[in-house]
Amino acid sequence: MARVTVEDCLDNVDNRFELVMLATKRSRQLATGGKEPKVAWENDKPTVVALREIAAGLVDYEVVAQEDIVEEEPLFAAFEEEANEPL
């Protein structure tokens, strides 16, 4: 298990607040099983894996947001189909 420091992550993120928000969102994606890790899992918790991905420069807001958009598209498509049905 590799140790991850805040300083390692701040090389790829602007500030600590952004780091917390990004790590939280990514760790939730990993914990729910919806997304595959971009680094070896190594028996770590989802939060540690998310921080390791950020420190390695593999995950940023664009990657996390893009994965969310792909996940939400079918939900909105089904909602729009129901809204267009005649009453």
From Swiss-Prot:
Pfam families referenced in this protein's UniProt entry, alphabetically: RNA_pol_Rpb6
S-S pairs: none
Any single GO CC term annotated in Swiss-Prot or TrEMBL for this entry: DNA-directed RNA polymerase complex
UniProt KW keywords: DNA-directed RNA polymerase, Nucleotidyltransferase, Transcription, Transferase
Entry GO MF terms: DNA binding; DNA-directed RNA polymerase activity
Keyword check for Ribonucleoprotein: no
InterPro entries: DNA-dir_RNA_pol_omega (IPR003716), Pol_omega/Rpo6/RPB6 (IPR006110), RPB6/omega-like_sf (IPR036161)
EC number(s) recorded for this UniProt protein: 2.7.7.6
GO biological process: DNA-templated transcription
UniProt keyword Transferase present: yes
Source domain of life: Bacteria
Catalytic activity: RNA(n) + a ribonucleoside 5'-triphosphate = RNA(n+1) + diphosphate
Quaternary structure note: The RNAP catalytic core consists of 2 alpha, 1 beta, 1 beta' and 1 omega subunit. When a sigma factor is associated with the core the holoenzyme is formed, which can initiate transcription.
Function, as annotated: Promotes RNA polymerase assembly. Latches the N- and C-terminal regions of the beta' subunit thereby facilitating its interaction with the beta and alpha subunits.
Similarity section: Belongs to the RNA polymerase subunit omega family.
NCBIfam families in UniProt: rpoZ
Full protein name: DNA-directed RNA polymerase subunit omega
UniProt lineage: Bacteria, Pseudomonadati, Pseudomonadota, Gammaproteobacteria, Pseudomonadales
Gene this chain is encoded by: rpoZ
